[in-house]
Amino acid sequence: HLVCRGRGHWGRTISLAVMAFSSVFLLSMSAVYHLLGPGTARDVMRHLDLAAIFVLSAGTVTPAHAILFRGFNRWVPLLLVWSVAATGISLRTIFSDRLMSGFGTGLFLVMGWGGLISCIVLWRRYDYSFVKLLLWGGVAYTAGVVIIGLNWPTVIPGVVTPHELWHVAVIVGLSMHWKFTFQFAGGLPDVESRPQASRVQAD
């Protein structure tokens, strides 16, 4: 349904399809990985599961910059975020767990919170109600990273551990960002309908 809202404009449709694909890719890789038992196939899926996080990070910002920004502010951030994603996936493939324990986590956070500048621009152009799902979705992802990094808390031993809480945080963050994107999937929001916005242009 998200992609369908972009019909009639090929640029919007492609950018929305990128986000939809990255979301489905992450959820699919994670599901298959957790269903497999120990072995080579599970090891391969673990690599794909972690690579999918980079793809989702870049895929999430793609429609926001493709639809809401123009010129330099559209293409440069997209080029940067996809370059970081490609770098992260490549390093993950080469160095495996030796890299991802700390450096990879840092890359995830940099990719996510690197979009804070864009969030502020959109906040000023429209208002807080427009960007709140983007902002709190980022908070949810960050909380998940902190939980999995600290390996704490364990709510119910063997049932609800930091790993399960990480997955909950990802679902919450993804849902918020999906709903945020749905706001403008059909085109640019009407600035005039948001009288408290300062109407700062990002062009």
Predicted regions and their residues:
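Multi-pass alpha-helical transmembrane bundles in non-GPCR membrane proteins
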Residues: 1-203
